Amino acid sequence: MELQEAIALIKTDGLNTKDKQTWADLGCGQGLFTYALAGLLAKGSTIYAIDENSSALKKINSTGNVIIKTLHSDFINDDLDLVNLDGILMANSLHYVKDKPAFIKKVRSYLKPESTFLVVEYDTDKPVATWVPYPAGFQSLKKIFSEAGYSTIKKLHEHSSIFNSGNIYSAIITR
């Protein structure tokens, strides 16, 4: 996927693009969606790009408008020193989380009360051992976040995927 495709996948009117924001990209990899989010946020915003792959993090740099701070950490098991985030982006990383309800409860402590989740995932519930061990198709995602107290779980866009001839979807989630 190219940067412009990633931007189109997460672009939404539900995202505050006028005010400075602080976000975390959990499981950011080499930063494709970190850069996509940076392209949408207001100048002066900050994104914490978090991944356990230190080699991938070395490829991520700040953009002209948005500060990107990399953090080498296991976002699933480590307690992150993050507070008052405006949002969390999880692009192709939620499917590595086995206990999603417990994880959502944990990361909620990183967020402001009026915050946003942006999720990009494969629209399947069928696991693939190494790459998608704990999938969350959109209907499953709705159920998980609804049970965690979130009221708005909206599918934004879809993009074809080479994985299993299916689709990747994006969703915005708010309380």
Each predicted region: which residue ranges?
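A short acidic, Gly/Pro-enriched loop at the edge of an enzyme's catalytic core
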Residues: 76-88
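Class I SAM-dependent methyltransferase SAM/SAH-binding core
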Residues: 24, 29-78
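Conserved beta-strand signature within the Rossmann-like core of class I S-adenosyl-L-methionine
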Residues: 114-122
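A short SAM/SAH-binding and catalytic strip from SAM-dependent methyltransferases
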Residues: 86-100
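Core SAM-dependent methyltransferase catalytic element
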Residues: 159-175
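A short glycine-rich, Lys/Arg-flanked "PGG" loop and its adjoining helix->strand segment in the class I
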Residues: 101-113
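Short alpha-helix
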Residues: 134-149
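Conserved alpha-helix/loop element of class I SAM-dependent methyltransferases that forms part
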Residues: 1-21, 36
